[in-house]
Amino acid sequence: MAAIELHKPEINADDDDDESPVEQVRLTVSNHDDPSLPVWTFRMWFLGLLSCILLSFLNTFFGYRTQPLMITMISVQVVTLPLGKLMARVLPETKYKIGSWEFSFNPGPFNVKEHVLISMFANAGAGFGSGTAYAVGIVDIIMAFYKRKISFLASWILVITTQILGYGWAGIMRKLVVDPAQMWWPTSVLQVSLFRALHEKDNARMSRGKFFVIAFVCSFAWYIFPAYLFLTLSSISWVCWAFPKSITAQQLGSGMSGLGIGAFALDWSVIASYLGSPLVTPFFAIVNVLVGYVLVMYMVIPISYWGMNVYEANKFPIFSSDLFDKQGQLYNISTIVNNKFELDMENYQQQGRVYLSTFFAISYGIGFAAIVSTLTHVALFNGKGIWQQVRASTKAKMDIHTRLMKKYKDIPGWWFYSLLAISLVLSLVLCIFMKDEIQMPWWGLLLASFMALTFTVPVSIITATTNQTPGLNIITEYLMGVLLPGRPIANVCFKTYGYISMSQAISFLNDFKLGHYMKIPPRSMFLVQFIGTVIAGTVNISVAWYLLTSVENICQKELLPPNSPWTCPSDRVFFDASVIWGLVGPKRIFGRLGNYPALNWFFLGGLIGPVLVWLLQKAFPTKTWISQINLPVLLGATAAMPPATSVNFNCWIIVGVIFNYFVFKYCKKWWQRYNYVLSAALDAGLAFMGVLLYFSLTMNGISINHWWGAKGENCPLASCPTAPGVLVDGCPVF
């Protein structure tokens, strides 16, 4: 198999003024603009608001399920194209005048600028790629895991302010990382490519629209089987079936609770969960994920569990995100939380230290290494280029796209500063007057805001030039865990206001660059993003509130009926993180008072690793494969595990290799024409079938769980411990 290299973008500051200095931009983005195209249309508002509300609802709704589904902006990009054209055909062209203002429901053909703004609405509804507002997870763990109360008002303020705060940081940094041509934002270039493909004249026998409809119908019809009639299709773990009484065999073969050897799925929600659609991931990235996954799952974990019994691994399941006590039983979190939402030291000392499954512990160590290696890797391999690009971005010379954007009124700075001030004031109100509900003191908010402002500049520059976004969340968790131990909600709130608001800022900036390339009036972008964010956040928390108050025992896997979909795997990991970093604190987990201080050495490993790769590249410059070693990706490959499982990775890698290597190499024209359309159709089909099944069958209690194929993957022993004397329901005692 031939190696596929990712080349650094060629930047030439001496190019002609009518060309971008970045080669990828020159090849993809049009140098022309038509300012007469209407953007503030009824079609844009109707389809944009509808898309925002639908995606907010669906992503929040499916986020609580065992196999969460995230519907992205790409689905809306494809679906709204025929809808926009249909509205252009059927809406009346009558013009209405109100004073000097003229309005029409149908000002002309549906155009690409309307389409871009609709997609920005949808991107807000999709949580800018995360599915739902991150702060919703805080409400989830308060109500479902800690069994405490929080008001809807406090929840709404928390969700909205953490989103809008990021918008304020984005406004401050916009001139530095959006306008300069050297800040080229690779993912925005990808979106431009898709928009241009969708709006090109299509006279082929199998148009993209027709292909989408066919794939959508097939996806819609098929999903009833893995979602309702034949649940085993979500994880076909045949090794468990061959060895129904062997714990070791089921640990090896389970796709949900084990190493997943031979496990696969015929369910798109399993394939696209956690890692996103493999159809839109570059092959180079897939190979890095594959190598990292194999190293961790099939080398490190077996040696740690069976070979060395690291951290008393045999007392616990081989793959679990749960927290345990020394006897291998589930840790009773509720007993160590007092009525002030703080750590009850007396009960904690009685119950003892917190233990993690070996996989969960090692995944934290790998996460430490991945964070540091990201910064080291970028400094060594991209530092010189980034510095040159930052220096170039301060020059007065503008590229063709920035000059074309000068035709439109810019966004006044006070718009951003006003939003920033309002969100900070509301956040302070939350911290001062509703402190009992969120625990975070006012100084915590100010410190988190300072960290966000500090990190937004370097991280956004790294993302804009290298397409790598360092994950700095553990830094905020670690810091607050040390400053204010024993307060779990304060810890997650600090992380959300600090790291997540910075992450939101980067998402906003990415959308701004897309609008920059597509020549969208800046004020239109601002209003669409702001309105979409407020609507999406409101829908997110409303749907979450409904599910949390209406689904009995939601997120409580041990109390739910067998095969219930409401297990909230992502919230379980989020809850465990709040316990580790907030309630118990880093000192009692990873410090001298805990079981895992040795994991701190992974920080050093992450620091040294990229240096070794860099030295190897310098020593052997002709060995091109060395330059393709990307330790942040290799180490971060398993960052989604848990809650992602081995069957998710198995299927994602297989499908990704098929489409982004074989199909891309041997059927490139098909890939260019239909690959993204197929991904969007698969997402949309199962999403609509999932909602239909819930409202027509699940809500009415209609199930068919009496037969073998409706009982999941049938690996009941995969989660059993193998240490002598450990008692777990349903497991043999050694």
From Swiss-Prot:
A biological process from GO: protein transport
Keywords: Membrane, Peptide transport, Protein transport, Transmembrane, Transmembrane helix, Transport
GO CC term, one of those recorded: membrane
Gene (name only): OPT2
Protein name: Oligopeptide transporter 2
Tissues in which the protein is found: Expressed in flowers, leaves, roots, and stems.
First-listed, main subcellular location of the protein, grouped into a coarse class: membrane
Induction remarks: Highly induced by iron deficiency.
Stated family: Belongs to the oligopeptide OPT transporter (TC 2.A.67.1) family.
Topology with respect to the bilayer: Multi-pass membrane protein
Pfam family, one: OPT
Family annotation (InterPro entries): Oligpept_transpt (IPR004648), OPT (IPR004813)
Transmembrane segments: 44-64, 68-88, 125-145, 152-172, 211-231, 252-272, 283-303, 359-379, 414-434, 442-462, 525-545, 596-616, 644-664, 677-697
